[in-house]
Amino acid sequence: MAASRSLVPDRLRLPLCFLGVFVCYFYYGILQEKITRGKYGEGPKQETFTFALTLVFIQCVINAMFAKILIQFFDTARVDRTRTWLYAACSVSYVGAMVSSNSALQFVNYPTQVLGKSCKPIPVMLLGVTLLKKKYPLAKYLCVLLIVAGVALFMYKPKKVVGIEEHTVGFGELLLLLSLTLDGLTGVSQDHMRAHYQTGSNHMMLNINLWSTVLLGAGILFTGELWEFLSFAERYPTIIYNILLFGLTSALGQSFIFMTVVYFGPLTCSIITTTRKFFTILASVILFANPISSMQWVGTVLVFLGLGLDAKFGKGTKKTSH
């Protein structure tokens, strides 16, 4: 880390982290919606992008390459002693979460997806209580209750709201729930690696993405999705440019998140990422005409209020066993 310290003056590090996370994931969100919910072609022969496995495969390849570069230049002294099977097991939930999240966009609009993915404290807390036997402070439960109330308001539709896109009821939300659960399992696995093997963030990023690349590579070959995607890309070559940018912004964003956690801690990182998600929803409403009702705005504010309070007051935990 000494090399990276000398590159950025202390007074500029926080603004750099904030802008890095905000810009990378803001553009990442725009690209994700453009790729997965855009219409390709003209007239009655319009097509949609349905290649979630291939999209995540390319994203994991770029993440792995980026992590390898970071290790080569900034983290050569660290020796990684983490068990290989742990990386392999973690990659299963990691891949499942990303594929489910991207697939959900075929059934729900982007604000719903972002809000759903913002509810990560819920499965993390449930898995912490059930698997790791953690005890959380009352503030944590109240914050999660606020998030649940916000999601309930956002999802509740007493009548059809004009301008809000209809989708297959329930399936997109189930995919988001699956993604959240798998995110929670990934978090538990990563905590275990850090606690028992002191795994560095760059090595974790490299190895989990390498294993994910193997799993997804087998998946896109076995299902034949790779050939369908190549045919789609031949008809609409701009998709390649968008996907490469999507993967690059994801990798850069991850590196800025790790930098924020290392230098300023998880609280600052939570505040930055929560702020970014709110403005991503706002941008989606403005840029992609995803109107949401006043009740849904109230639900959105409650969710982000709960996330902000959780970042500030809900972090204390006591482990009763491991």
Curated annotation (Swiss-Prot):
A motif (Di-lysine motif) lies at residues 318-322. It is found in: Endoplasmic reticulum membrane. GO terms for molecular function: ATP:ADP antiporter activity; UDP-galactose transmembrane transporter activity; UDP-glucose transmembrane transporter activity. Disulfide bonds: none annotated. It is a multi-pass membrane protein. It catalyses: ADP(in) + ATP(out) = ADP(out) + ATP(in); UDP(out) + ATP(in) = UDP(in) + ATP(out); UTP(out) + ATP(in) = UTP(in) + ATP(out); dATP(out) + ATP(in) = dATP(in) + ATP(out). Its main location: endoplasmic reticulum. It holds the Pfam family UAA. ATP:ADP antiporter that catalyzes the exchange of ATP and ADP across the endoplasmic reticulum (ER) membrane. Imports ATP from the cytosol to the ER lumen and exports ADP in the opposite direction. Regulates ER energy metabolism and protein biogenesis. Appears to be part of a calcium-dependent ER to cytosol low energy response axis, where calcium efflux from ER to the cytosol triggers ATP import into the ER lumen to maintain sufficient ATP supply. Provides ATP to ER chaperone HSPA5 that drives protein folding and trafficking in the ER. The di-lysine motif confers endoplasmic reticulum localization for type I membrane proteins. The chain crosses the membrane at residues 12-32, 51-71, 85-105, 136-156, 168-188, 210-230, 243-263, 285-305. It comes from the Eukaryota. It comes from Rattus norvegicus (Rat). One of its GO terms (biological process) is UDP-galactose transmembrane transport. PANTHER family: SOLUTE CARRIER FAMILY 35 MEMBER B (PTHR10778), SOLUTE CARRIER FAMILY 35 MEMBER B1 (PTHR10778:SF10). Keywords: Antiport, Endoplasmic reticulum, Membrane, Transmembrane, Transmembrane helix, Transport. This is Solute carrier family 35 member B1. GO terms for cellular component: endoplasmic reticulum membrane; Golgi membrane. Belongs to the nucleotide-sugar transporter family. SLC35B subfamily.
